[in-house]
Amino acid sequence: PLAADAFDVCIRFGEPPDARVIARRIAPNRRLLCAAPAYLERRGTPKLPSDLARHDCIGIRQGDDAYGQWRLTAGRKTEVVKVRGALSTNDGEIAVNWALDGHGIVMRAEWDVARYLRSGRLVQVLADHQTPPADIYAIYPQRHQTAARVRAFVDFLAERFATSSPGH
């Protein structure tokens, strides 16, 4: 658990897992579903979440997230879709590279894929559906909450993220 580790500040995407640490949200962040245009030309573009079951989805094992299940929300309706594919990793950069190479659809943080979406190397799919948030948090042990160096660093991060946009 984070609370047992010796660290000053940890950066985390998504909800903090441990109530024994201080978590400050430093930036909003969405997860997006995207694929290379070549993949979508070959396999078609999913129109509904259930269509994902017939696609190659690139799996990313992260923390306690349910592996192989993607949660998508439109309005008040949330669907949990069991996805599958030949490729999975615990490294988000590798997963994005596989998507860029046309191997399937990936769910990844907007900060990781924004430049590829802008350039057209990736295309967002099911854009009308929301995925679970992956807001960016600075996490630090309670014993550091009064440390000036920790406060200064976390304030710096929050200011930096506030003046940046995903992919820049």
Give the residues covered by each predicted segment.
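Acidic, Gly/Pro-rich loop/turn segments at junctions of secondary structure
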Residues: 1-89
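Hydrophobic residues within well-ordered alpha-helices
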Residues: 2, 52, 98-102, 117
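Paired acidic/hydrophobic, glycine-rich loop segments that form the ligand-binding mouth/hinge
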Residues: 8-12, 104-108, 124
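Alpha-helical segments flanking ligand/cofactor-binding loops in enzyme cores
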Residues: 24, 50, 96-97, 151
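A conserved hydrophobic position in a structured secondary element of the catalytic/binding core
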Residues: 34-35, 90, 108, 157
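Short, hydrophobic alpha-helical packing/hinge segments within bilobed ligand-binding/sensory domains
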Residues: 92-96, 113
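C-terminal effector-binding regulatory domain of bacterial HTH transcription factors
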Residues: 110-119, 123, 129-168
